[in-house]
Amino acid sequence: MDKLLIRGGRPLMGEVTISGAKNAALPELCAALLCPEPLTLANVPRLQDVGTTLKVLRHLGVEAERSAVLPDQVRLDATRITTREAPYELVKTMRASILVLGPLLARFGEARVSLPGGCAIGSRPVDQHIKGLQAMGAQIVVEHGYIVARAERLKGARITTDMVTVTGTENLLMAATLADGETVLENAAQEPEITDLAELLIAMGAQIEGQGTHRIRIQGVERLHAPAVPHQIIPDRIETGTFLCAVAATGGDVTLRRTRADHLDAVLDKLREACTELECGADWIRVRAAGRPKGVNLRTSEYPAFPTDMQAQFMALNCIAQGTSRVIETIFENRFMHVNELVRLGAHIAVDGHTAIVEGIARLSGATVMATDLRASASLVIAGLVAEGETTVERIYHLDRGYDQMETKLRGIGADIERIK
């Protein structure tokens, strides 16, 4: 099983290019199921989760191939779907596999999708997906570990979810594009990835208003078509934030290319609070560490507030910062599993319920640590980059789920890091 070996203490310098957003790519790949024409997506990252999604789609009968000439492009042809079932063997490793449910049901009137897996960071139920589809007229039962759904044609409805749910909003948004009549999604998630999905669907002929707000209106149409040009997936704001934290922690000076500062307001505000110098352009961010950072208090919440997917990386930064800081997690329970591993590197962290109190220290010391989920693995890499001596990060398959060639990009800006067996 692959590991990362990191020799810490080297500041990061130079330029790095940000990949396409994982959390936009996954629903947009699934959106191909809505369209009986070949669809091309550009800026598709090379991630394990993308590979898993493509396996699910191919099982359903989608022809999906990366371009040999433009390897960031993926062509998907869902003209001839051969099955409406996404089996446990494919779905178990990734929660986002549930995103085939809405498109299959909307276009074909039936779907059988295994209950999903993914990161072990707490309960992330799919009941809001089911509730919303039932409001649109679907008949759904959960049996033998599968969601079995049927509908003659989905009907437009006003749907208010009990909580803000990103994948729930995406599933219902895709399903509503082919429904009969108007659907209104209340309490919708506002993430940039949802706006990007909506822009793709609009390019396919969907009628959507209000994306990026808590109320999205969708007027169903009879049929969607492929856009005239490939849809460009937005940059990954979480990869961007992760590299920003790594540079701030190591004392470096790096320019991030092909990214968007306007998707990162809360993260950039906290980095400035930590006394990190930032310059932003239309598609770039320059980050310079002005000495040892200051610890910052943060509280995770739904977009546009501070993202839960950046909590672990900022905790790693706080570990070597001046002062004591509080990190409050409000989105997922059990998302402090990286704490014990950071403590192995010498960090001073105490957890009380949903709050972690971090006492910053001058230096960490290298050790062997174990990744427990996707973003926790990124925090351990950041900690390893600043620790004295060697740090080995085990179980980095978590990292590969959501970061495109992370160690290669880090080496390109000066990190001493290598993948080993």
From Swiss-Prot:
Known role: Cell wall formation. Adds enolpyruvyl to UDP-N-acetylglucosamine.
KW Hydrolase (keyword) present: no
Catalyses which reaction(s): phosphoenolpyruvate + UDP-N-acetyl-alpha-D-glucosamine = UDP-N-acetyl-3-O-(1-carboxyvinyl)-alpha-D-glucosamine + phosphate
PANTHER family listed in its UniProt record: UDP-N-ACETYLGLUCOSAMINE 1-CARBOXYVINYLTRANSFERASE (PTHR43783:SF1)
GO cellular component: a single term: cytoplasm
Gene name per UniProt: murA
Sequence positions that bind UDP-N-acetyl-alpha-D-glucosamine: R95, R124, P125, V126, D127, Q128, D309, I331
Family: Belongs to the EPSP synthase family. MurA subfamily.
Main location: cytoplasm
Uppermost EC category: transferase
Positions of the catalytic residues: C119 (proton donor)
Any one GO molecular-function label of the UniProt entry: UDP-N-acetylglucosamine 1-carboxyvinyltransferase activity
Source organism of this protein record: Leptothrix cholodnii (strain ATCC 51168 / LMG 8142 / SP-6)
Gene Ontology biological process terms in this record: cell division; cell wall organization; peptidoglycan biosynthetic process; regulation of cell shape; UDP-N-acetylgalactosamine biosynthetic process
Keywords, ordered alphabetically: Cell cycle, Cell division, Cell shape, Cell wall biogenesis/degradation, Cytoplasm, Peptidoglycan synthesis, Pyruvate, Transferase
Pathway: Cell wall biogenesis; peptidoglycan biosynthesis
Localization (cell): Cytoplasm
Alphabetical list of Gene3D superfamilies matching this protein: Enolpyruvate transferase domain
Binding positions (phosphoenolpyruvate): K22, N23
Enzyme Commission designation: 2.5.1.7
Protein name, UniProt field: UDP-N-acetylglucosamine 1-carboxyvinyltransferase
Modified residues (2-(S-cysteinyl)pyruvic acid O-phosphothioketal): C119
